Every structure is written in C-alpha cells, then in structure tokens.
A protein has these predicted regions:
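Extended substrate/RNA-proximal surfaces in nucleic-acid metabolism proteins
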Residues: 54-142
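An N-terminally biased module of ancient metal coordination in phosphate/nucleic-acid-related enzymes
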Residues: 1-78
C-alpha cells in the first residue's frame, strides 16, 4: 500500500529518530498513514500523534510485543515479535508492557555483569547515562 507504513520504531525503543522526527521523515517520503510500533512500549504514541497534526498524517496506535514460544517437541524457546495495531482497551496492555520494561532493564544489567570480568569494571550506570536518562528503554538499536 503506497503511503502507508504499519511498522516503525522511534528512539523510545530501538529506532534512531524521535517520534516527531519519525513523523516528519515519513511525511517527506509521502507517508500519510503511520503506525508507531515501538518494542514493548507505547510511550511515543502521544508525541507521534501531536507531530502528525502538522503533516495531515493519520497515526495508528501500535506496539511490537516481544514474547517467547516454546516448541514442545524440541524443548526449545523461540523469541517471537507480534505487531499489534489499532488497540482499543489499553490498560491491560500497559501493565504487560511495564513488565517488559523491567525485563529489559534486568537483561541489560545481566549483560553488563557478564562484561565485568572482561573489562574490569561495572559499566551499568554508564550504559544508563548513555541512553539519555531512560533506564527503562535500554534496547539494541537497529
């Protein structure tokens, strides 16, 4: 569908642009309908909606939810990302996403702890400082 992008990320999760910058860049490319689908957070939605007003752009609420799927026959766990669009009752979802933020922060701490023997110091606080005072948004930018 021309002019529609239903899977985007801002710097609220693992993108590089702020929601406002993302909307502006999308508008420059001729996008008129955009879904902000940050990983495990909808914190950028209001910012995107506000920015979209000056571009006559429609914003669709969205989120990319990280989950695990277990295959019983192999006893292996697989990471699965599910993109949810245009949700209505958001309260239960917000509770789930808050848990995901805590899991991400713990994962970042575990990674930093594994690095201590290699580099000789705990860099967790430095990592948090580098993510612009957003410790609940420690992600792998792509």
């Amino acid at each position: 569908m021309e002019g529609v992008d239903l899977h985007t990320h801002s710097n609220i999760s693992d993108g590089t642009f702020t929601p406002k910058q993302l909307v502006a860049a999308a508008a420059e490319k001729g996008i008129h309908t955009l879904a902000l689908t940050d990983h495990d957070t909808m914190d950028g939605l209001a910012l995107a909606e506000s920015a979209a007003k000056s571009h006559a752009m429609r914003i669709i609420s969205g989120v990319e939810i990280s989950s695990q799927w277990s295959r019983p026959s192999t006893q292996k766990n697989y990471g699965v990302h599910v993109v949810a669009l245009n949700m209505q009752d958001l309260e239960p979802l917000h509770k789930c996403l808050e848990q995901q933020k805590q899991i991400r922060a713990r994962r970042a701490k575990q990674i930093c702890d594994l690095l201590i023997p290699l580099i000789g110091e705990d860099i967790y606080l430095d990592v948090l400082a580098k993510v612009e005072q957003m410790p609940d948004r420690v992600t792998r930018t792509h």
